[in-house]
Amino acid sequence: TSILSQGGCIDSFGVGERMITAKTDPVFGAVYKICAVEENGKFAPRIKVSETVEKITNPGLKSVYRVYDEEGHAVADLITGFDEKVDFSTPYRYVDPEKPWKNRSYENCTAKPLLHKVIEGGKRLTKTKTLQELQAYVKKQLDNEIWEEEQRFENPHKHYIDMSPDYYEMKMSMLHNIRTV
């Protein structure tokens, strides 16, 4: 990556299992797993447990919000239960799953939902965007929302993924119940 920024020539980039993770730390936390199962017309949360924290799934139906500071920069993504109400008009308490003992809150922030229904009953609900529209959307996010520190290739700043207190408690309860079985 620093080769590119220094003007080096690259003929191609490869993608593969051994190429996206280090052999000594083969963890990629963006794998799709079952998070809920429909039982009697309702969705029951499911969780996959692993010795590697990044591989433990986030159970149940959920909503995900991108949280913005006063300047419009994304400060974190917030996972909540699907029907959970989020109010940012006052300081909003959240849980950092990596440091759950800390008492933290978003203040003077706004949020927008990241998950949108695109298909229902086999029918597409939204118009397909052109390649140019998608490129413009991503460019706008990179230019205006995502911190430069998160975009650098070497030692990037981590984008935070936080949880609502209720969602975090549900996840911890499921993990506790698995440990006691």
Protein language model features and the residues they cover:
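Gly/Ser/Thr/Ala-enriched C-terminal appendages of enzymes
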Residues: 2-181
